């Protein structure tokens, strides 16, 4: 059930000679893009500002369309003219994007948009098995448990992760934001059903 978190842990570089610029003998490292979230506070503050701007754009979109967009790219250019807002400072520094979820097919973005109308990706289904459904349907199901705290947009490039909730609040959480709510319901209650 914790396959997605295990993958993240296995992707972190190991201590020893292999991690110092490549494997022994000059071979390239096993994973050239390890999942290594940033703990830099300045990057986190700048990312929060991006998420607040994204929230303002989503709220304007919702006012016009009575629903959330299918993708963050649906906000461009009418609701979000500056696409640099979609790039986290960690991505600017490292070039890395989120290793999990579904990335926007139309614009480069560091952020995972949780309310797409695409099927739940396999990497997520490995952790949260259950019915086949879209990300949007699953997140709306989770809203019955966590209400307005369900993430609409996430940045997993930080430790702790940053979340923009459907209610417009930016908050920190572990990679599994659902762990913040397991007192009310067990983790399995958040699986698609």
Sequence positions of predicted segments:
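Activation segment
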Residues: 84, 97, 172-174
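Hydrophobic membrane-insertion alpha-helices, especially the h-region
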Residues: 1-4
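Acidic glycine-/aspartate-rich tracts in secreted/extracellular proteins
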Residues: 91-94
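Short cysteine-rich clusters marking metal-coordination/redox-active sites
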Residues: 88
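Conserved hydrophobic/amphipathic alpha-helical signal-anchor segments
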Residues: 7-85, 170, 180-181, 185-191
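N-terminal pilin/flagellin-like segments and related low-complexity appendage regions
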Residues: 61, 97-98, 113
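Active-site-flanking ligand-binding surface segments in enzyme catalytic domains
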Residues: 102-193
């Amino acid at each position: 059930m914790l396959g997605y978190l295990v993958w993240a842990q296995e992707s972190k570089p190991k201590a020893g000679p292999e991690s110092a610029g490549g494997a022994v003998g000059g071979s390239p490292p096993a994973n050239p893009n390890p999942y290594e979230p940033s703990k830099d506070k300045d990057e986190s503050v700048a990312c929060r500002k991006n998420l607040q701007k994204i929230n303002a754009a989503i709220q304007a979109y919702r006012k016009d369309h009575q629903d959330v967009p299918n993708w963050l790219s649906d906000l461009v250019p009418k609701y979000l003219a500056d696409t640099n807002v979609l790039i986290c400072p960690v991505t600017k520094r490292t070039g890395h994007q989120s290793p999990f979820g579904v990335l926007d097919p139309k614009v480069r973005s560091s952020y995972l948009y949780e309310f797409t109308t695409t099927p739940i990706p396999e990497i997520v289904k490995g952790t949260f098995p259950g019915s086949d459904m879209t990300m949007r349907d699953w997140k709306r199901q989770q809203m019955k448990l966590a209400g307005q705290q369900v993430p609409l947009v996430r940045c997993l490039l930080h430790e702790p992760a940053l979340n923009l909730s459907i209610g417009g609040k930016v908050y920190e959480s572990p990679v599994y934001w659902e762990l913040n709510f397991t007192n009310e319901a067990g983790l399995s209650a958040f699986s698609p059903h």
